Amino acid sequence: MANTNIKLLLRGETPRLIDEWQIAPKFWDAVRNEVDKRDDDGQFILTGSAVPPSYDEIFHTGTGRFAWLKLRTMSLWESGDSTGEVSLAKLFAADRTDYFVEGINPIDLEHLAYLTCRGGWPKALDKKSKQAALQQAFEYFEAVTRFDVSRVDGVNRDSELARRIMRSYARNQGSQATAGTILADIANNESTEVSENTIYSYIKALKKIFVIEDSTAWN
């Protein structure tokens, strides 16, 4: 329907949510045009788990019409696992002379390890057992390496190589690991020759589906 009568999909009560809009990139310009006609804020919410595979069907940047918001998994405070007694924002505030760090953390080391592995996936929080909650991360990892890393731009990629790259990224978390570093890390277990360009291709695909996000300098 997006290819035949996209305006029909924009009708209805607002704000109107269009999920996974990147599957039909024509929504971008259609929404931009509709926003100009209505001349009102908060008309549409476009959500997606990846960037569009191609921008050939997008002809306008959307400047002045769209506001960007990046969603991540929940923090421990959002999931209810942290008391939130210590504020990171206040710790790094310019004027913090009157802020005293105090609080009691009920989380022991074993439970902290569990929370780290579980992550902040909303679906994981609804599970009745820890094992079921942990399984969500494994299922996401499997879906990313089997399907999403190739589907994002239509390039057929090896799922096992995708797994090794993600594991290498995990081992190098918090460091400035180059493609060469990743390549050297996985070379010992890779039977076929892999180039840096191939590594870059996988990394680019993983960034497009928001699996990898480079940390910016905090200062």
Predicted region positions:
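Structural recognition of the conserved hydrophobic beta-strand(s) that form the central parallel beta-sheet
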Residues: 17-18, 43-49, 70, 79
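Conserved Walker B
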Residues: 20-24
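Conserved small helical "lid"/interfacial subdomain of P-loop NTPases
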Residues: 73-94
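Short glycine-rich substrate-engagement loop in P-loop NTPases that contacts/grips substrate
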Residues: 1-15
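Accessory nucleic acid-recognition modules appended to NTPase machines
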Residues: 125, 129-219
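Short regulatory helix/loop adjacent to the ATP-binding pocket of P-loop NTPases
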Residues: 33, 52-68, 80-85
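Conserved catalytic/switch belt of AAA+ P-loop NTPases
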Residues: 28-52, 60
